[in-house]
Amino acid sequence: MEMNKKTIFVTGATSGVGLKITELLVAQGHIVYATGRNEVALKTLQRLGANVIQADLTSLTAIDKVCAQLPALDVAIFSAGVGKFAIAPMLTDEDITQMVELNIRVPIYLAKRIATKMIAREQGQLIFIGSQAGKVATPKASVYAATKHAIVGFTNGLRMELAPYNIKVTAIHPGPIDTPFLDKVNDESGYRESLGRLLLTPEEVAQATVKTIERPVREVNLPRMMGWTSKLYALAPATIEFLAKPLFNKK
């Protein structure tokens, strides 16, 4: 059965998961508005059929300009994000600011503006690309995990706030993904290889995300085993930290 054509906005559309989501949506015939910083990637998406908007979303002025260019939306997918991996004392203030800006403030500012218009229409869906780091923090990712914990809290509260207006809120929480994002992790310890089947492809995450448009759900945990691990972590954090310490410390 073909998916009904929808008008969809995607952030972080020029790389990684956001790029694959955008390509998949365009291929399915949806009307897609894609934003990102990479001008070359945006031109490629434009040739595929996407409506592109180049912007640095860490600026409130830019956020307002982008929102002013958007039509009535059926779905908004917030995929833009950044990670800097080191123990917290070794991160620069700029590293921390960048993660807080792009991973927390940007999706919240955008969701506020887009949800306001969806409320008036009493329909819509907001999809946030979170992370398993929002469920289970690990060494060298404490600040990154904090930003993703914020998204877990925000989506859980927002879901209840928007339910009376027939607006769905979905959170996608993937584990490690085989993208340039992962290259920022020190790989001398063999972290990438140690992940084995836990390592996701951008295509897998994109397909799981797009699937929730037709069948909205509360959240998606990828891979499934990590979803179960996060549930066990909530019950016995010290035990999970002890058992998973060898893997955690490879990062």
Residue ranges and their predicted role:
Residues 14-15:
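Conserved glycine-rich cofactor-binding loop
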Residues 80-84:
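Conserved NAD(P)H cofactor-binding loop of Rossmann-fold oxidoreductase domains
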Residues 87-88, 92-100:
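Substrate-binding pocket helix/loop in short-chain dehydrogenase/reductase
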Residues 111, 147:
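Active-site helix of classical SDR
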Residues 116, 160-163:
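Alpha-helical segment proximal to the catalytic Tyr-Lys
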Residues 131:
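Residue(s) in the substrate-gating loop at a strand-loop-helix junction
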Residues 164-224:
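SDR active-site lid
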